[in-house]
């Protein structure tokens, strides 16, 4: 089963879609919320000279006038150059069955779904009257370790998606259609050159390297170094101090000629790094345990004095 992400409060969560999951003859009323929010800094485009904000106007190339959103429709140009115009009324009349429903089509093993298909992630919240059937679907998927494959229409577009349990909620992942996935077309897949041949000994050594780099996945161990450096730069600009110095780039060792030798050195480095990480983790664990004991002892002394 796919590991569940940590679920917490996301500021500004708002309903993005409202409808029902069609689960056999049972309808489960739900609301859809974006499960993610990027932490990137939001920049404005400004004029270098006077720092005035830059605005982009919607201008018609035919009449040269600025156009309001209400006067903008969609246009599709056919292969022979004809322009087919569609407005919101045309799109609303499309005979789409899943307009206000999440149509559950089938349930499949998670390992059969290639992650390449996944797009965005959403939380599903049950309507108050649908909590029991919501929990039933959640527990059924959890017990069978399956993903529900569904169709949903969002922003006037029908989308394939999957639903899975994550903690106490159901999570929906929108997906690409098969014809939206590009096939890799690389020369090395078809060339007859021998530069893709590897020996059993090299595969064994590469496997050893992978095994020595294997850990339990904890996303909190990783940091966005770019955003941290950007925060330091903005802070320095605000205070009028020197910006942080750029970290030196790692030395480029050039093309690897002795692949086996490079693998052996990599395995040694991975073992050393793994031992160091374990010592650091154990030390941090001991500090937390010691801190907890001190807090407990302090509370006990306080209770005794009381």
Curated annotation (Swiss-Prot):
Transmembrane segments: none annotated. CDD domains: KU_like (cd00789). Residues 291-300 have a biased composition (Basic and acidic residues). InterPro entries: Ku70/Ku80_beta-barrel_dom, Prok_Ku, SPOC-like_C_dom_sf. Residues 21-206 form the Ku domain. GO terms for biological process: DNA recombination; double-strand break repair via nonhomologous end joining. Residues 274-290 have a biased composition (Basic residues). GO terms for molecular function: double-stranded DNA binding. SUPFAM superfamilies: SPOC domain-like. Keywords: DNA damage, DNA recombination, DNA repair, DNA-binding. The keyword DNA-binding applies. Homodimer. Interacts with LigD. NCBIfam families: Ku_bact. HAMAP family: Prokaryotic_Ku. Belongs to the prokaryotic Ku family. With LigD forms a non-homologous end joining (NHEJ) DNA repair enzyme, which repairs dsDNA breaks with reduced fidelity. Binds linear dsDNA with 5'- and 3'- overhangs but not closed circular dsDNA nor ssDNA. Recruits and stimulates the ligase activity of LigD. This is Non-homologous end joining protein Ku 2. It comes from Saccharopolyspora erythraea (strain ATCC 11635 / DSM 40517 / JCM 4748 / NBRC 13426 / NCIMB 8594 / NRRL 2338). The gene is ku2.
